[in-house]
């Protein structure tokens, strides 16, 4: 299945450690489009790129969905830019895991004010 690879650390930190799946094209609102989306996503995956449409993001809150959408945009742009110097390089799995663990550690601390 095509995808945007995990070549930006933030993808791993925001629930996309294997990258962003790409759903095949289907006309907007048609059963084919819905079937392609369902076939492309897995539990816990908060985004999918819809071929010939754009990104579809879903998360616990609208704020997190917007954040993940920005991360997907950053990864797509990084992939395009990297194409001019040989192509993007995926982050090794152990480093993706470390990035996610670090993000979870930060989140568990909550917001602190000075």
Predicted feature residues:
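Glycine-rich flexible loops
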Residues: 1-114
